[in-house]
Curated annotation (Swiss-Prot):
Reactions catalysed: [(1->4)-alpha-D-galacturonosyl](n) + H2O = alpha-D-galacturonate + [(1->4)-alpha-D-galacturonosyl](n-1)
Protein name: Exopolygalacturonase
Function: May function in depolymerizing pectin during pollen development, germination, and tube growth. Acts as an exo-polygalacturonase.
Position of the signal peptide: 1-5
PTM text: Glycosylated.
Active-site residues from the entry: 200, 223
Class in the EC hierarchy, top level: hydrolase
Subcellular location: Secreted; Secreted, Cell wall; Golgi apparatus; Endoplasmic reticulum
Record organism: Platanus acerifolia
Length: 377
């Protein structure tokens, strides 16, 4: 398949990329030439197997559109200490970027996962993410595969108008901190027609995310699609306008999840929609938890002060491997408001069935039928 955009092509082989050697210098030279080019331009890593150290593609670029096409299989150094930063392939301050191709970015993360439990050790050094997108506008990422990242596969920070289409993310279900796509402080994010199998959240939405639309995502193994955690730090920006629709979860720990810390600084998440979702043997299909406190790092006595409002759950069906299929635990200090719960049909076939639910600190409006029945205190 040819290069997808018209314009000049900057093939890394022409800049000294050699099969067995580290191609990072060749990639950076090709990027500099493409970025300085007036018209549309594309950096091409053609079919083949390559080794590549850390690379950072910096903008702004002269042309209005620039492509980065990966058709080869590119491997990161296996040793986590070979990285200066927390990103292996990073893109900064670029308008009109398209990252595409039939290739694979292989983070060779197996060594890092053994040391990666930063949840329990706040001072640990984060391993490198496969892909970092920072301060981008009008970006498209399509068709590529991220394999075995050392940490998050894809991190999106302070971006505006970025789309992920037909992306594949793969790592074992046992890999630690390998979130598929993490979004923070970004507006206008679309994730569609994408397959994510990993050891942590398939998609996680952090503070400051607005207008994020997630459709036609297959998630599993993994920890589901999460909003949060919110309220861990001071001055977090609010979350607004998150839609998760037409997605399938298979063998995951969670389906859709909202998590906020107790005893939190003030904050908010509003306009959250979870609709037309299929759960295949999911441990916690629906979980809204405002007492999220992993590893006992906080006190649950003081309530979360993250205000959750305008939340819709509708047409969520399938099978739960946990008896409590729906958990809605809103903050006792700041109850959820304007929650709508429509059709839910989740079955549990294990011991002590059928499925049950818990619901507290909210008075939802119900429509249609809920299985299990949901009674809120």
């Amino acid at each position: 398949r040819g290069v997808q955009s018209s314009g000049s092509v900057f093939n890394v082989n022409d800049y000294g990329a050699k099969g067995a050697g580290d191609i990072s210098q060749a990639v950076m030279k090709a990027w500099k030439a493409a970025c300085a080019s007036q018209g549309p331009s594309t950096v091409l890593i053609p079919k083949g197997n390559y080794n590549m150290g850390e690379v950072a593609m910096q903008g702004p670029c002269k042309g209005s559109k620039i492509g980065f096409q990966i058709d080869g299989v590119v491997k990161a150094p296996a040793d986590p200490s070979k990285f200066k930063s927390d990103g292996w392939v990073s893109f900064y301050r670029i308008d009109g970027l398209t990252v595409s191709g039939t290739g694979t970015l292989d983070g060779q993360g197996q060594t890092a996962w053994a040391k990666n439990n930063c949840d329990k050790n706040p001072n640990c050094k984060h391993a490198a993410m496969n892909l970092r997108f920072d301060f981008l506008k009008h970006a498209m990422v399509r068709d590529i595969t991220s394999l075995n990242s050392k940490m998050f596969h894809i991190n999106v920070l302070e971006c505006e108008d970025i789309t992920f289409q037909h992306v594949t993310v793969t790592a074992p279900g046992t890999s630690i901190n390998t979130d598929g796509i993490h979004v923070g402080i970004s507006k206008g994010v679309t994730i569609t027609n994408t397959k994510i199998a990993t050891g942590d959240d398939c998609i996680s939405i952090g503070p400051g995310s607005q207008n994020v639309t997630i459709t036609q995502v297959n998630c599993g193994p993994g920890h589901g699609i999460s909003i949060g955690s919110l309220g861990r730090y001071n001055n977090e920006k609010e979350v607004r306008g998150i839609t998760v629709k037409g997605c399938t979860f298979s063998g995951t720990m969670n389906g859709v999840r909202v998590k906020t810390w107790p005893n939190s600084p003030p904050g908010a998440a509003t306009d959250l929609t979870f609709q037309d979702l299929t759960m295949n043997n999911v441990q916690n299909p629906v979980i809204l938890d405002q007492e999220y406190c992993p590893y006992g790092q906080c006190s649950r006595q003081a309530p979360s002060r993250i205000k959750l409002s305008n939340i819709n759950f509708n047409n969520i069906r399938g099978t739960s491997t946990g008896k409590v299929a729906v958990v809605i635990a809103c903050s006792h200090g700041m109850p959820c408001s304007n929650m709508k719960i429509g059709e839910i049909n989740l079955s549990y076939r294990g011991a002590g069935g059928p499925a049950t639910s818990t619901c507290s600190n909210v008075k939802p409006t119900f429509s249609g039928k809920q299985v299990p029945a949901i009674k809120c205190a």
